Amino acid sequence: MISRDEFDALVARGHTRIPLVREVFSDLDTPLSVYLKLADGPYTFLFESVEGGATWGRYSIIGLPAKRVYRLRGHELEVEDSGEVTERRHLDDPLAEIEKLRLQYDVPRLPQLPAFSGGLVGYFGFETIGYIEPRLAQWDRADELGTPDVLLMLAEEVAVFDNLKGRLYLIVHADPAQPQAYAEAQRRLDALVYRLRQGGASYPQLTQSIALDESDFKSSFTKEEFEAMVERAKEYIRAGDIFQVVPSQRLSVGFNARPVDVYRALRALNPSPYMYFVDLGDSQIVGSSPEILARLKDGKVVVRPLAGTRKRGATEEEDRALEAELLADPKERAEHVMLIDLGRNDIGRISETGTVEVSESFAIERYSHVMHIVSQVQGTALPNLSYMDVLKATFPAGTLSGAPKIRALEIIQELEPYKRNIYAGAIGWIGWWGDADTAIAIRTAVIQNGRLHVQAGAGIVYDSDPAAEWEETMNKGRALFRAVAQAAKGL
C-alpha cells in the first residue's frame, strides 16, 4: 500500500489515476466466490485460465461494477456514467478513438501490481471488421441479437486472485481530481475487505428446475440447409475465389436460470485457456475459449491458430489413436498450414523485420469434447505499436473467417442469415500501459431476453464433407449444451 506522501508525489507527477492496493490472505475463497461476494451484478466480469488443458493459471481477475461504459454501434459512440448516458457522438475512426480513450488515463506502473490491474475490458464484436476493411462495413444481414458492435467497461476496481499463494489483491484507482481521493480509496478498500469477511456468498437455490438437452437448441439452419451452404462454399473454392472459408450456425434455446450457473458448469466441464463470465446487465457472456486472438505483452505480439478437430475418445488409448489420425489427415494438415501462413502474414505486418517465428507447431490440445491442432506465431512488435494496430492486423481470426481473409469474409456475409455479433469477435482486456490479451469469442454463450445463443463454425476446404462439417459444429457446441442443461436443472 502506498503512503499518503507517495500518493501526493504521484499526483504531482500528473497521473490521472493512482492505484491503491490491499493484499488479503484469502485461501478459503475461490475466484468464483470472490466474484459472488464483491462483483455479482451489471458491468462486472470474471476471467480465469486453464493452461495445457489441466493446470489452472496463476491469476484470476474479478472486475467490480464499472461506472463508465463505452458502446459503439456502427460509428456512433455512447458513453454511460453511473447508469446515465452522458455523451453520444459520431466517430470517423472508432478504433483510433478507443486508443485515445485509453491514453486519457495516466496510471503509474507500480512494482507490486500484476500484469492487469485495470483498464478497458469487454468485447469487439465480429462486425468490428467494418472499421478495418471499408468494403465490409455494410453487413446487411438481420441483427437478431442487437448487441453493440463494441462494448468496453472502464475497470477501475478489480480483485486479482493469486491461485498459487491463496492471496487476493484488491485494487482501487483513486482520481486525484476528486476531493479526499486518497481517504476515499482507503475507505473503499476497507468496505471490500469487510464484505469478503462476511462469510459465504449469498446464493439462493433455483426455484424451478428445467430439463434441457441438445435437441432443444434450434439452429438458424436445418441440417440440409447447412449442408447446402457448405456446397455453395465449395463452389467458391473450386472457382478459385478462396482456399478456405468458415461458415457457422447459431443455436438458441429458451433460458431463465442464473447465467452465472452456466459459467459454474462450464468451468468444470470444459476448462480452457480463456474462461470468462461478463455481466452487461441486459445480457451476459459466458465462455471457455481455447484460442487467443492476439496478445501484446512486453513488446511481443502472439497469435495461436487452432484448426483441425477430432472428438475426444472414450479412453486414453482411443484419444491417442484419434490424435495420430488427426495429425496424419492431409486435409487437416493443409488447413492448419494455411492458417499458420495467415498468422505469419498478419504478425509480419506489425513486427520488426526478421523477428516473426513459429514458436510451436502442430501440438495437440485436448478439451472436454474435442481435441485440436495448435501452433503459435510470434514477433517483436514495431516501436510505439498499440493494441488497436494489432487488432487491425489480426481481426478477425483466420480460423473463424478463411483465406484469403477478405474474400472469405465477403462470402460469409453472403452465406449466413444473421450478423455474428459477439461470436468470432474478441473478448478480453487492454491494460493501462498498452499490454492486451484477447480471446476469440468461440465456445461462448450470449444470454439475453430469456434466450441463450451458441454459435459454432467449420472450416470448409475443397474436399470437405458437408455432413461431417455439420457434425463438427455440433461437437464444438456440446460442452456448452451440457453446461446449459446442468444450469437449467440446478447445480
Q: What name fits each language-model region?
A:
Residues M1-L491:
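Extended alpha-helical targeting/anchoring segments
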